[in-house]
């Protein structure tokens, strides 16, 4: 048995002696709870208007919804209880369907196997002189569902928190790896604020890495100019596929944009968080969304993947979904840089080269080799590169890192409302 697999099993044992069993059970629960639905949206009456895709049960009660900035491709997670979709353009921004707004109903298959995606759903929205029949559309405001990922799973959108709270403890990070569904059901995932929202401060979104929490950024956040910027913290179960995490992040940002109307946002990501952020930005580019993103700063990110993830896919008794995304030869990483960054977004790469690993002679930060941090395709699209004599975690505590991140932020003046 390869040495890496023995290490993975040891990690699982340290996580609770039943790590792989927990993962197997949790992934089954995930498949039983969530269905992916995707397709395209056409809206000739208002090509620039936001669209809400609402999942309804058999009685026409709304279960969850997702906001899209404009027509094009859509992808939504729904509960197996979902029997219908109702899609409409929220012309007056009240998060409710009103007569005269373009819409399109759709009935989902009466039986869709657990975990099997529903694809190829192409919908054309159009206005009608009379409202659709009762029970086919959501009646009333949908604001109460704004924090809901799917039925029974709520996320945090703008909840004010402190980094020393128990929800950000390392044990929660471990849950996010080995029991991602339990993490979601516990209501831990979402975008947290460290202070009440201020329209006069530019948001800086911090995205942690695998087995991490927002607390990892405590010292870096303390170095940010809080008179000009407001930290936002994305918290997610790091055991899931990276594209799924990136899509969820886009949904949350679109929801906050609909509510807060912010014009600018900067992204600062550590480790695997850089891959999550790059996945988000690829979707933004392909769907012409996220015009509010100004800069993307990645810190010690494995853009070339991790051989450990590949070995986990090949040898582990249960495969953690994120390992497929992190496998160097896998489709996710192979295509990661085939899509250019969105227009106007600069990528700044910060990397560490202090190797503190006693069992590795590979150059890097003790966790991520340099050839992964400095993948050529990433360098080609980067606006700047900056290296530090720090390891994988100490780079977040470095005063030099904080100084440079502040410099990146200050180079981009905020847009006028």
Predicted stretch roles:
Residues 1-4:
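Positively charged n-region of N-terminal signal peptides that target proteins for export
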Residues 6-15:
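Bacterial N-terminal signal peptides
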Residues 17-22, 30-73, 77-80, 86-204, ...:
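Flexible, membrane-associating and regulatory peripheral segments of lipid-active enzymes
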Residues 197-264:
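Active-site catalytic motif of lipid deacylating hydrolases and related acyltransferases
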Residues 203-206, 230-234, 266-267, 295-299, ...:
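Structural recognition of the beta-strand scaffold that forms the well-ordered cores
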Residues 219, 278-283:
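Active-site signature of alpha/beta-hydrolase-fold catalytic machinery across serine-
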Residues 268-269, 273-277, 300:
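Gly/Ala-rich beta-loop-alpha elbow adjacent to hydrolase catalytic centers
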Residues 282-417:
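Helical cap/lid subdomain of alpha/beta-hydrolase-fold lipid enzymes
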């Amino acid at each position: 048995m390869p040495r890496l697999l023995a290490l993975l099993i040891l990690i699982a044992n340290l996580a609770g002696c039943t790590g792989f069993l927990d993962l197997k059970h949790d992934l089954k629960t995930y498949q039983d709870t969530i269905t992916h639905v995707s397709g395209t949206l056409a809206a000739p009456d208002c090509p620039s208007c936001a669209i809400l895709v609402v999942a309804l049960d058999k009685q026409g009660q709304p279960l969850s919804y997702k906001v899209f900035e404009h027509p094009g491709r859509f992808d939504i997670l729904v509960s197996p209880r979902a029997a219908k979709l109702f899609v409409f353009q929220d012309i007056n921004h009240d998060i409710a369907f009103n007569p005269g707004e373009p819409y399109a109903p759709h009935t989902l298959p009466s039986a869709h196997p657990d975990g099997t995606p529903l694809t190829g759903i192409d919908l054309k929205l159009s206005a009608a002189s009379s409202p659709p029949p009762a029970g086919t559309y959501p009646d009333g405001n949908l604001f109460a569902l704004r924090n809901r990922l799917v039925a029974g799973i709520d996320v945090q959108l703008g909840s004010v928190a402190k980094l020393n709270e128990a929800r950000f403890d390392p044990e929660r990070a471990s849950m996010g790896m080995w029991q991602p569904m339990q993490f979601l059901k516990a209501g831990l995932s979402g975008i947290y604020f460290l202070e009440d929202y201020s329209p006069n401060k530019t948001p800086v979104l911090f995205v942690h890495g695998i087995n991490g929490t927002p607390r990892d950024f405590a010292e870096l956040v303390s170095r940010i100019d809080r008179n000009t910027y407001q930290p936002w913290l994305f918290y997610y179960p790091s055991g899931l596929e990276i594209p799924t995490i990136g899509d969820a992040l886009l949904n949350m940002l679109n929801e906050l944009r609909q509510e807060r109307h912010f014009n600018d946002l900067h992204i600062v990501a550590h480790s695997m968080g850089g891959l999550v952020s790059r996945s988000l930005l690829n979707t933004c580019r392909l769907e012409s969304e996220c015009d509010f993103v100004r800069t993307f700063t990645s810190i010690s990110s494995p853009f070339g993947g991790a051989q450990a993830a590949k070995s986990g896919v090949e040898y582990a008794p249960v495969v953690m979904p994120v390992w497929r995304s992190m496998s160097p030869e896998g489709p996710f990483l192979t295509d990661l840089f085939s899509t250019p960054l969105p227009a106007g977004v600069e990528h700044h790469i910060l990397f560490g080269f202090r190797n503190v690993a006693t069992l590795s002679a590979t150059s890097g930060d003790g966790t991520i080799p340099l050839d992964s941090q400095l993948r050529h395709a990433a360098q080609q699209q980067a606006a700047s590169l900056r290296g530090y004599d720090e390891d994988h975690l100490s780079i977040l505590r470095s005063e030099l890192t904080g100084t440079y991140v502040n410099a990146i932020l200050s180079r981009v003046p905020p847009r006028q409302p």
